[in-house]
A protein has these predicted regions:
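Active-site histidine-anchored catalytic micro-motif
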Residues: 1-183
Length: 183
């Protein structure tokens, strides 16, 4: 479907910063290279974001040890039939932390700046939430190794959650995540 659709000029990829971030969002102006070639970062959008929210660049080093952005790139490189740029963003906050007014303000400030910057750019933009779904096993806090049952139950929950995204129901999506306590 993506190959047949009108394709955007820019892909804003928001991925998970597993080690956490002090400022909740980390943007980088570095290009990314995969075995399929170089994916350039959209410098004009990144520089505008930097002007509006300077601290978003403070932890760009976090990109060095993360994989959330890179996982999306080979898919885009093989599916998008025209040149494109990206805006790589790492984020680190939980749905439950949004009850903290300071966290909520920081998130709203960054997302407003991002939305305004995308609009002002005049470019067509696609936002990719490069979030990871369920993690199973002892290393993720489970009391036992995963079984076929736990795997399928987890997959059902992930699909339930994604149904709200597919149906463009952000309030239901947020409520689901809070109910599941970001698990």
């Amino acid at each position: 479907e993506l190959q047949e659709a009108q394709q955007p000029d820019v892909y804003v990829i928001i991925g998970t910063a597993h080690a956490g971030l002090e400022h909740l969002f980390a943007v980088t102006d570095k290009d990314f290279e995969t075995p399929l070639g170089l994916v350039p970062t959209d410098q004009s959008i990144v520089q505008r974001l930097k002007a509006l929210v300077p601290e978003c660049m403070d932890e760009e080093i976090a990109h060095q040890s993360e994989h959330a952005i890179e996982f999306q790139l080979p898919f885009l490189q093989t599916s998008v039939s025209k040149p494109f740029t990206m805006v790589p963003i790492l984020s680190s906050f939980s749905a439950s932390s949004l009850t903290d007014p300071t966290v909520q303000h920081s998130v709203e400030r960054f997302l407003t700046a991002l939305r305004d910057t995308m609009t002002e750019s005049g470019k067509t933009v696609c936002v990719i939430a490069a979030g990871e779904l369920a993690h199973l096993g002892l290393r993720y806090g489970d009391k036992a190794p995963p079984t076929d049952f736990s795997f399928h139950r987890s997959m059902q929950r992930d699909l339930e959650m994604l149904k709200h995204v597919e149906e463009l129901k952000p309030a239901e999506f947020a409520a689901y995540i809070q109910r599941e306590q970001d698990q």
